[in-house]
Amino acid sequence: MLRVVGEPRHIDRAIKRLQGALKGVPARGVRLTWRGGELRTAIHWTRDDSFWWAFEPRRARDGIAARHALLLGYAPDPPTKRESITCEINLPRAGTDRKVAGIVVADANGALYLAHSGRMGGARSGQRKAGFREFLADGVWRKVTWPDGEESEALIVAPLDSPRLTRLLGQFVDSVRRFKAGEPASPRSGLCVAPMQVESTVTACDRRLVDAALHEELAKRGLFGGAHDLFSLRGVRPQPLFALVADGRADELALAVGSLSLASARNGPDIRPILIAPASLADGDAALDALPFACVRFRWRGARAVFDGLDDALEG
């Protein structure tokens, strides 16, 4: 289980890692507004991930300890001189504080993660602060242990050592934007095999990026048939059924192959099983090449997953 860390050196390490990973085009003298306040500061726009960010120190007040505030705003276009804050992640400078939503957690190996309690302020009228948990049900939610032994659930935003940290943070900002705008949660697809529940936290975060990239590629091909099932084709048979192997562990691969084989036996020509596997695992693997269904390789191009052979697999 992940544990909440409050040691100043760990928090400083987390802040330095965030500041080192977050780049972007600077925009100075920007007026940032939120419900009940505003400030003027410099922000940085990460164009490829559609958000801007800024760090601001916050003094102790109203029983809340001094903290680092990571201000975030959704920005598919270059920021203007006035921007609205989509959300902020507050991290105590030392110790732990359940009154703020930002959390730094560590795994058994000492790797650090940026996490969020899931309580989301500033939402629309009628939205519960706990409603974000329901909205982002497919997020990477994990049990965490506090120094006093209490346990709670937190959303893992990103592993702080991940080369894809910025992309994961952008994904979080977009999720918050959609939630606060009152958009419906993305429905779960009935045409994707459910992932293993025991996969590592790092793998689970990467899996969401691969899922999102696959979704975009299928959308480009006009393959979506409606709001109820994101992966349904417009009455076309066979329907694709995807199983994703995110990191290539033997048990994960066995589950994916077994699930596709069973689904194929049950549904016959009505489905087209497609295995999605890392190129590092799939390239030159005779066993995967011998499978009775297509294997699409994915590889990382920067922070984006790209797929080799997807069109051939869809066409059969």
Where are these regions (language model features)?
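Acidic-basic catalytic patches of nuclease active cores, encompassing PD-(D/E)XK
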Residues: 1-61, 180-226
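Generic detector of solvent-exposed, compositionally biased contiguous segments
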Residues: 36-75, 126-159
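Active-site beta-strand-loop-beta-strand hairpin of nuclease catalytic cores
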Residues: 77-82, 232-242, 267
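Short, hydrophobic/proline-enriched secondary-structure or compact coil segments at domain edges
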Residues: 80-94
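Nucleic-acid nuclease catalytic cores
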Residues: 94-98, 104-150, 246, 253, ...
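The feature marks a conserved, polyanion-engaging helical scaffold used by nucleic-acid processing enzymes
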Residues: 133-221
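Mg2+/Mn2+-dependent nuclease catalytic core
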Residues: 238-240, 248-267
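Charged, structured surface patches that assemble and position nucleic-acid processing machinery
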Residues: 294-313
